[in-house]
């Protein structure tokens, strides 16, 4: 099991990070952490300490200009009513070769695993394409930063993968799933996905409005966001919506 995990997350050969939760939660409900860079190779022994719950580690995907895995980091605007289910459903519906894993902060890491080393630029291009289409997350790896590894304290972990039905997976089942979704470089380059249309005229919405619809409203900007939505809805009817209709749309969008 350890060898399979080390092989799956092979990355920067010269350094790794350790992370520790502070016990504090920010205004969004995200668990905060401290990070320390260790300038030495990540050994199987250190991986074992991670699995045993002694040291939480993170790995940078890049090995020079190549990588064997990448990650879309879903960090929701608010964690209060957050659920991974819609992201898991998107992965299943559009047959994306991604493995969803709960992150230490309570969000979601969507991992892509490759059979061979691939160009960092090419992997980022594909992940950015999927992110822009389906997820609109703020961070996509590789990006010269480390990703905290899953299955810390693996026998009692809270950082686990999900299957297609959003059920948590033990580490052995995660490894089976991740290895089954591994792509060759050629398969990655040739992979096509269907257009994402969660509602009518989705492709005509500007990216900022798409983001606001798919993610809960940040409280400080809610009114501005609702205003942008209503402007768009009014344009769709050539300005024929009355005040009552706009109010009803605002109430529905604000749920």
Range-by-range predicted roles:
Residues 63-73, 103-113, 146, 226-227:
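Glycine-rich, often proline-containing surface loops adjacent to acidic residues and nearby aromatics
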Residues 51-58, 91-98, 215:
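Short amphipathic beta-strand starts and helix->beta connectors
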Residues 77, 107-108, 112-126, 153, ...:
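Modules that initiate DNA replication and primer synthesis
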Residues 5, 134-196:
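Catalytic "initiation/cleavage/transfer" segments centered on a nucleophilic residue
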Residues 80-93, 113-138, 155-173:
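Helical (often loop-to-helix) elements that flank the catalytic cores of nucleotide-handling enzymes
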Residues 59-62, 98-105, 138-142:
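Short beta-strand
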Residues 72, 88-90, 94-97, 194-196:
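Catalytic residues for metal-mediated phosphoryl-transfer on nucleic acids/nucleotides
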Residues 1-69, 77-87, 145-147, 151-154:
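DNA replication initiation on ssDNA origins
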């Amino acid at each position: 099991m350890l060898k399979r995990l080390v092989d799956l997350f092979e990355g920067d050969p010269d350094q790794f990070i350790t992370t520790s939760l502070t016990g504090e939660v920010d205004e969004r409900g995200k668990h905060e952490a401290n990070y320390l860079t260790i300038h030495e190779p990540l050994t199987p022994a250190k991986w074992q300490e991670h699995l045993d719950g002694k040291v939480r580690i993170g790995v940078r995907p890049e090995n020079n200009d190549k990588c064997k895995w990448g990650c879309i980091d879903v960090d929701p605007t608010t964690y209060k009513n957050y659920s991974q289910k819609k992201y898991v459903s998107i992965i299943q519906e559009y047959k994306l070769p991604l493995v969803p894993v709960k992150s230490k902060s309570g969000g979601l890491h969507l991992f892509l695993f490759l059979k061979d080393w691939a160009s960092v630029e090419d992997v980022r291009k594909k992940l950015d394409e999927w992110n822009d289409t389906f997820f609109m997350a703020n961070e996509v790896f590789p990006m010269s930063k480390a990703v905290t590894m899953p299955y810390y304290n693996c026998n009692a972990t809270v950082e686990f993968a999900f299957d297609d039905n959003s059920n948590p997976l033990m580490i052995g089942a995660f490894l089976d799933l991740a290895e089954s979704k591994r792509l060759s470089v050629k398969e990655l380059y040739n992979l096509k996905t269907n257009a994402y249309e969660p509602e009518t005229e989705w492709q005509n919405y500007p990216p900022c409005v798409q983001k606001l619809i798919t993610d809960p409203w940040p409280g400080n900007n809610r009114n501005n966001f609702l205003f942008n939505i209503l402007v768009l809805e009014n344009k769709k009817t050539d300005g024929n919506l009355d005040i009552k209709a706009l109010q009803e749309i605002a109430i529905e969008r604000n749920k």
